[in-house]
Amino acid sequence: MQIRDLVQKYILYLFSDEVYREFIYTKRPYISAFHLEGIEQNVVLIDSVSKRYSECGIRIGALITKNKEVHNAVMKFCQARLSPPLIGQVIAEASLSTPQEYMEEVYDEYLARRNFLIDQLNQIPGVFAPTPMGAFYVMVQLPVDDTDQFCQWCLTDFQYEGQTVMMAPGSGFYTNPEQGKKQVRMAYILNKEDLGKAMLVLKKA
């Protein structure tokens, strides 16, 4: 059963987070939830400048819907606030004129980092890293019993040649924390040289 069928059958709202749409590595055409015919009034699309333009912390985005009732309800919340931060607005507006060539360079760089990181991770005994189809992070299975404890240990009690690694325990990314107990989330936002150093430190840990 397709998502559209579920939305129609159970009369659901489909909240579609599409902030990573520029970073899809499958070579397939990007399909927005708004392209699904028959559920136009049920779709609420969420977008942001923070991922596309590497502006983490800039809380500027959009909530888009064709449903007037949803729109009116959202506007009540919007009008209860003065505005998004001024500096964020200025930065976001300037970002909209970013050349397409730059976006293509960023895409190619993330793709190269992804391929490098996945290859390095899967060479470490006991580690499994699936190849993500988009975004710039990966959920990694580690040969440990509890990644919450392991991540804390790496920060407080471990170093290799004066360096350590900081990772996000996987338990925080699941409705059932047990599903991520042996996983960590890694972002490939560093250059390949630094990623290589981090993988050496992780292997030693």
Regions from the PLM with identified roles:
Residues 1-205:
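PLP-dependent class I/II
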